[in-house]
Amino acid sequence: MPGGKGKSVGGKGAPKDASGKTQRSHSAKAGLQFPCGRIKRFLKNNTQNKMRVGAKAAVYVTAVLEYLTAEVLELAGNAAKDLKVKRITPRHLQLAIRGDEELDTLIRATIAFGGVLPRINRALLLKVEQKKKSKIEA
């Protein structure tokens, strides 16, 4: 039926294996969004003497990376929302990571264009408050 209004002919459809079932990736089987196969390849290429890497190890590492990424993005999104902007910048990532104690200990790297955390030393703050009180009394 070329050119007609019917069922289209041809095309692969979903890829199938020899038994006729549709193929599912390791990521889909594990319910993950990050690519397990790619991370397994990175693990194999970056080990000494090209050591063997099990499939479950790659899935586990993928799940950990996906969880940490989701956690950081959620906190950075909250920081961006507090500042009433719609785009997450390195500043928001910095505020999110340094605001969470566990992420701060895990990620000790310097974030480019992240700025510094707003913090005033208590000793300086107390002197300013004392000056204000003395002016009010006088």
Curated annotation (Swiss-Prot):
Acetylated once deposited into chromatin. The modification N6-acetyllysine is found at K5, K12. It is found in: Nucleus; Chromosome. Residues 1-32 are annotated as: Disordered. SUPFAM superfamilies: Histone-fold. One of its GO terms (molecular function) is DNA binding. The keyword Cell membrane does not apply. It comes from the Eukaryota. One of its GO terms (cellular component) is nucleus. Transmembrane segments: none annotated. InterPro entries: Histone-fold, Histone_H2A, Histone_H2A/H2B/H3, Histone_H2A_C. Residues 1-13 have a biased composition (Gly residues). Coiled coil: none annotated. Variant histone H2A which can replace H2A in some nucleosomes. Nucleosomes wrap and compact DNA into chromatin, limiting DNA accessibility to the cellular machineries which require DNA as a template. Histones thereby play a central role in transcription regulation, DNA repair, DNA replication and chromosomal stability. DNA accessibility is regulated via a complex set of post-translational modifications of histones, also called histone code, and nucleosome remodeling. Belongs to the histone H2A family. The nucleosome is a histone octamer containing two molecules each of H2A, H2B, H3 and H4 assembled in one H3-H4 heterotetramer and two H2A-H2B heterodimers. The octamer wraps approximately 147 bp of DNA. H2A or its variant H2A.Z forms a heterodimer with H2B. H2A.Z associates with the VPS72/SWC2 subunit of the SWR1 chromatin remodeling complex. Also interacts with RBP1/DNA-directed RNA polymerase II largest subunit. This is Histone H2A.Z. It comes from Coccidioides immitis (strain RS) (Valley fever fungus).
